[in-house]
Curated annotation (Swiss-Prot):
Its EC number is 2.7.2.1. This is Acetate kinase. Homodimer. One of its GO terms (cellular component) is cytoplasm. CDD domains: ASKHA_NBD_AcK_PK. Pfam families: Acetate_kinase. Keywords: ATP-binding, Cytoplasm, Kinase, Magnesium, Metal-binding, Nucleotide-binding, Transferase. The record marks 178, 239 as: Transition state stabilizer. The gene is ackA. It catalyses: acetate + ATP = acetyl phosphate + ADP. GO terms for molecular function: acetate kinase activity; ATP binding; magnesium ion binding.
Length: 397
């Protein structure tokens, strides 16, 4: 029985999943935290059950050794499940990578060269790739880029209206993120509706602590809310989303904030956290339900921004067949879905209150019978999408 190992390597973490290449079943999952921070923590779940323990993990190479040891003790030994590929999540592929790519030394060098576009992610992704290639030297390794799905954007969609030569020199343009999720979900919607992907006009809302919207026309991304970085777009847990750039000049002059302080403000101290002191949507909703006006305003701001993108993308698509909510908040917050869809009957979006309120772990339709636009909740599965793309890359050679 062959399998694909999917790896998501963060700066101090290693998340992994072993997926059966034929059944697409998750055979084992795990998370290793606090890599390089002294005593690390391992959580592993496989056929033999679940385990959680601590271990000194100085670097990603040690994290892979710990992962192999966990596989060896839970009944999902990689000897019994030989690997067809190792699929790696890489956040930023710039404009160089538009498809899953078999890792070579040149590919590693290119990922490293793009680190200035994703300084918090690409170096950690590359550490994981190098450690994995050392652990599995005979297995093909495939990089799957979050930005790749958005390489189909037209120049009018990805161009910022600034000095063209300066933008070209410093690689300033819209790249978009969450592409692996948007690709998976848009495909799952077509399957659920029993319609060809190529004929569907879709909007996918990936709503977690990070959040993005994507307009998908016939399976192709034509616009997305995140930009050169994941900061642009929707209101998020700790990120501001769209903001007038002149606000930064104003805060620099009047509050004396430097570049690094402004970066910290917009990426880590804004969004829900900045508005309410809570970065988790569940906490914000709990406080709002107790009568807190500031928390209520934050929820209204989130919904307002969602409506803004739903309307804009419906216009860009020239109509809409399906609106889909996914990721942690999108899948589990019926009140936000209701607020985002309220008043959008003019666009053909009609939510069914009972269907929307019903709790279910699976993919489901939550729009009313007769709604011109089908509204869905579809759980994302980025690991499975990475596994699929890794196998496709290996098969293509």
């Amino acid at each position: 029985m062959s399998a694909v190992l999917v790896v998501n390597s963060g700066s101090s973490s290693l998340k992994y999943q072993l997926i059966d290449a034929k059944s697409e079943e998750a055979l084992a999952t795990g998370l290793i935290e606090r890599v390089g921070e002294g005593e690390g923590r391992i959580r592993h779940r496989g056929p033999g059950g679940s385990a959680e323990y601590t271990l000194v993990i100085p670097d990603h190479t040690a994290a892979f050794r710990a992962m192999l040891a966990a596989f060896g003790t839970d009944g999902s030994s990689l000897v019994e499940h030989p690997l067809d590929a190792v699929g790696h999540r890489v956040v930023h592929g710039g404009k160089r990578f538009f498809e899953p790519t078999i890792v070579t030394p040149l590919v590693e060098a290119n990922i490293d060269d793009l680190a200035d576009l994703a300084p918090l992610h690409n170096p950690a992704n590359l550490d994981g790739i190098r450690a994995a290639r050392q652990a599995f030297p005979a297995v093909p390794h495939v990089a799957v880029f979050d930005t790749a799905f958005h390489q189909t954007l037209e120049p009018a969609a990805y161009t910022y209206a600034i000095d063209a030569a300066l933008a070209e020199e410093h690689r300033v343009r819209r790249y978009g993120f969450h592409g692996t999720s948007h690709k998976y979900v848009s495909g799952a919607v077509a399957e659920l509706l029993g319609r060809p992907l190529g004929e569907l006009k879709q909007i996918v809302l990936h709503l977690g602590n990070g959040a993005s919207a994507c307009a998908v026309d016939g399976g192709r991304s034509i616009d997305t809310s995140m930009g050169m970085t994941p900061l642009e777009g929707l209101v998020m847990g700790t990120r501001s989303g769209d903001i007038d750039p002149a606000v930064l000049f104003h805060l620099s002059r009047r509050a004396g904030l430097g570049i690094d302080e402004l970066d910290e403000l917009l990426n880590r101290r804004s969004g829900l956290l900045g508005l309410t002191g809570h970065g988790d949507m569940r906490d914000v909703r709990r406080v709002a339900e107790s009568g807190d006006a500031v928390a209520r305003l934050a929820l209204d701001t989130v919904a307002h921004r969602l409506k803004h993108y739903i309307g804009a993308y419906t216009a860009l698509l020239g109509g809409l067949d399906a609106l889909t909510f996914t990721a942690g908040v999108g899948e589990n917050d019926p009140d936000l879905r209701a607020a985002a869809c309220k008043g959008l009957g003019v666009l053909g979006i009609q939510l069914d209150p009972e269907r929307n309120a019903a709790r279910s772990p699976g993919a489901r339709i939550v729009s009313a019978d007769g709604s011109p636009v089908t509204v869905l909740v579809v759980p994302t599965n980025e690991e499975l999408e990475i596994a699929r793309q890794a196998l496709q890359a290996v098969a293509a050679g």
